[in-house]
A protein has these predicted regions:
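Intrinsically disordered, low-complexity, charge-dense segments enriched in Lys/Arg
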Residues: 98-101, 105-173
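Basic helix-turn-helix/winged-helix DNA-binding cores
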Residues: 1-103
Length: 173
């Protein structure tokens, strides 16, 4: 991995299964865990990663199954991590549509969320490797080249977001 690749790593922090305690956590502990995990991904110092209001809104909108005794299980933390990843790209309603089947599977005990999340994490590693390879070939020495790269990344981001939105629309029927 080159020095440039080292700069890209913080862009893709993920909450790893090993990072999640095997005990249920209170909301403040959940927030601390997410702040420690995703702090390196923030654009500016003091940027908010996760707040009580956000978590309460996710619960109110039923983005994850209900908590018991104000404690969040490992499955809740996995779902909140997925919400965190999705919220920068798609709307809350789209997140709900995306996670509905997952939540039902967890609630009905027909889905192993940890195995699903492990598979997701494997996909993120492959995605990062592809991204790093593409970025390594980009020449960003001249301002005009940087502008071209910025525009290209924004365009790719829009394409991926639109593709995700189409898939979400197909989930809705």
């Amino acid at each position: 991995m080159t020095h440039d690749d080292d700069k890209l790593r913080p862009l893709d922090r993920q909450l790893q299964l090993d990072d999640i305690p095997n005990i249920d956590l209170y909301m403040d502990q959940v927030i601390q865990l997410f702040e420690r995990t995703f702090e390196a991904t923030t654009r500016t110092e003091g940027e908010t990663i996760l707040t009580k209001t956000m978590i309460n809104n996710y619960a109110k909108k039923k983005l994850f199954f209900p908590v018991t005794n104000k404690k969040y299980t490992k499955n809740h933390l996995i779902l909140i991590s997925l919400i965190y990843q999705l919220k920068g790209t798609v709307s809350i309603n789209d997140i709900k549509a995306t996670l509905t089947e997952l939540n039902q599977g967890v609630a009905n005990e027909t889905l192993n969320l940890e195995a699903f999340y492990a598979s997701y994490l494997e996909n993120t590693v492959r995605n990062l490797e592809t991204f790093e390879a593409e970025q390594a070939s980009a020449d960003e020495n001249e301002p005009i080249d940087q502008l071209q790269q910025i525009l290209s990344l924004a365009h790719m981001s829009n394409l991926y977001r639109r593709a995700a939105e189409r898939m979400i629309d197909q989930l809705d029927g």
